[in-house]
Amino acid sequence: MNALTAVQNNAVDSGQDYSGFTLTPSAQSPRLLELTFTEQTTKQFLEQVAEWPVQALEYKSFLRFRVAKILDDLCANQLQPLLLKTLLNRAEGALLINAVGVDDVKQADEMVKLATAVAHLIGRSNFDAMSGQYYARFVVKNVDNSDSYLRQPHRVMELHNDGTYVEEITDYVLMMKIDEQNMQGGNSLLLHLDDWEHLDNYFRHPLARRPMRFAAPPSKNVSKDVFHPVFDVDQQGRPVMRYIDQFVQPKDFEEGVWLSELSDAIETSKGILSVPVPVGKFLLINNLFWLHGRDRFTPHPDLRRELMRQRGYFAYASNHYQTHQ
């Protein structure tokens, strides 16, 4: 598991003005910040990246960093350091991001470009085997016959970390709402590890550090099992997690009972946040100390939600962001 790199300073300065965007605490929690790009910044960004279709970003990976630089330059180079400090800050580590005027499925390509730019200011998004690209778009409908809970609308998708069944480092997760029709419910669910009242009990359990087998269903296009413990620590010895109830494969009675109790303790936590994410907005979270999931939808025959995800690793100049602080 990748060790979390901590920073000393809080990313939020309540009195600071930013160029090209605003930053405020969310209504749900001071740990979750809302970042909004201004109408002018959004317009200029989309104009400057218009020459590159999404396919160009798929084929030429360096262009993902090119569009990231364009966005940061439009924000007077204040955006990249703020994103990194927020996501690496244990007290926060989560952002709800949107751009004024980008809020319709007809702008889906523009949404992908914007999310790609933000993600590549903090690192690089990994190859997504489910889609064959560095991002994945998928649809939730009223009826689902898939082999995981990802697209099933009428049940809660339990809280989990991403990247549990792959060998690549998964430091961050980005989840964007591209479209929504005939939709009620289905809020994003978030739980910060430090707000989980049962953390100490499970983190100190003898099974917390035992390597366990994680195996994905066929739809994930990953055939190799991986082995790792559910819990680890960051560079300061604080708990981090790499867990999903659907894909962990207990080898015996002891592991199975413990994992079942762990799942119940997570799902019944009083620290869970319910966060509405309108079309065009996206969540960006530190995957090592935030768990995420989704609440159930109200059934409707024409229910439709389209999502886009990216997940990857942090990468930055070490002389700008101190470790062990």
From Swiss-Prot:
GO terms for biological process: L-lysine catabolic process; response to carbon starvation. Disruption phenotype: Cells lacking this gene accumulate higher levels of glutarate than wild-type during carbon starvation and entry into the stationary phase. Its cofactor is Fe(2+). It catalyses: glutarate + 2-oxoglutarate + O2 = (S)-2-hydroxyglutarate + succinate + CO2. Induction: Expression is induced by RpoS during carbon starvation and at stationary phase. Is also regulated by cAMP-CRP and Lrp, which play the roles of a nearly essential activator and of a positive modulator, respectively. Repressed by CsiR. Makes part of the operon glaH-lhgD-gabDTP. Keywords: Dioxygenase, Iron, Metal-binding, Oxidoreductase. InterPro entries: AlphaKG_dependent_hydroxylases (IPR050411), GlaH (IPR015038), TauD-like_sf (IPR042098). Fe cation binds at H160, D162, H292. SUPFAM superfamilies: Clavaminate synthase-like (SSF51197). Acts as an alpha-ketoglutarate-dependent dioxygenase catalyzing hydroxylation of glutarate (GA) to L-2-hydroxyglutarate (L2HG) in the stationary phase of E.coli. Functions in a L-lysine degradation pathway that proceeds via cadaverine, glutarate and L-2-hydroxyglutarate. Other dicarboxylic acids (oxalate, malonate, succinate, adipate, and pimelate) are not substrates for this enzyme. This is Glutarate 2-hydroxylase. The gene is glaH.
